[in-house]
Amino acid sequence: MAVTRDEIQRVARLARLSLSEEEIETFAEQLNRILEHVERINRLDVADVPPTYHGVALQHPFREDKPLPSLDREAVLALAPEAEAGCYKVPKITEG
């Protein structure tokens, strides 16, 4: 199924784009090459290819969720220019 110049012009009108004749030709050629490539992909025999969710096999991408020691809250807050109610206090940047 080839993309025609009329289809390019119709889509351009719907998108409110003004295309030159040269751009229409270029887009038609590019879209037709893309569609040819998709057609070649569709013809591939993938009957023996198992379905996958990811292109690369991932082996245990997540570590075990176990608690680890963290920084002391008071020591971290001592580094803050300002702190209030156990939290960093930052300048207001929005109005309202």
Swiss-Prot record:
Q: What does this protein do?
A: Allows the formation of correctly charged Asn-tRNA(Asn) or Gln-tRNA(Gln) through the transamidation of misacylated Asp-tRNA(Asn) or Glu-tRNA(Gln) in organisms which lack either or both of asparaginyl-tRNA or glutaminyl-tRNA synthetases. The reaction takes place in the presence of glutamine and ATP through an activated phospho-Asp-tRNA(Asn) or phospho-Glu-tRNA(Gln).
MF terms per GO, please?
asparaginyl-tRNA synthase (glutamine-hydrolyzing) activity; ATP binding; glutaminyl-tRNA synthase (glutamine-hydrolyzing) activity
Assembly = Heterotrimer of A, B and C subunits.
Lineage top rank: taxon: Bacteria
Q: Example GO biological process term?
A: regulation of translational fidelity
Matches recorded under InterPro entries: Asp/Glu-ADT_sf_sub_c, GatC
- EC number, as in UniProt: 6.3.5.-
Q: Which UniProt keywords apply?
A: ATP-binding, Ligase, Nucleotide-binding, Protein biosynthesis
Q: Which reaction does it catalyse?
A: L-glutamyl-tRNA(Gln) + L-glutamine + ATP + H2O = L-glutaminyl-tRNA(Gln) + L-glutamate + ADP + phosphate + H(+); L-aspartyl-tRNA(Asn) + L-glutamine + ATP + H2O = L-asparaginyl-tRNA(Asn) + L-glutamate + ADP + phosphate + 2 H(+)
Q: What is this protein called?
A: Aspartyl/glutamyl-tRNA(Asn/Gln) amidotransferase subunit C
**What family does the database annotate?**
Belongs to the GatC family.
**What organism is the protein native to?**
Symbiobacterium thermophilum (strain DSM 24528 / JCM 14929 / IAM 14863 / T)
Query: Does Ligase appear among the keywords?
Result: yes
Which residues are in coiled coils?
A: none
Known Pfam families for this protein? GatC
| Family matches, as PANTHER family | GLUTAMYL-TRNA(GLN) AMIDOTRANSFERASE SUBUNIT C, MITOCHONDRIAL
Top EC class, one word: ligase
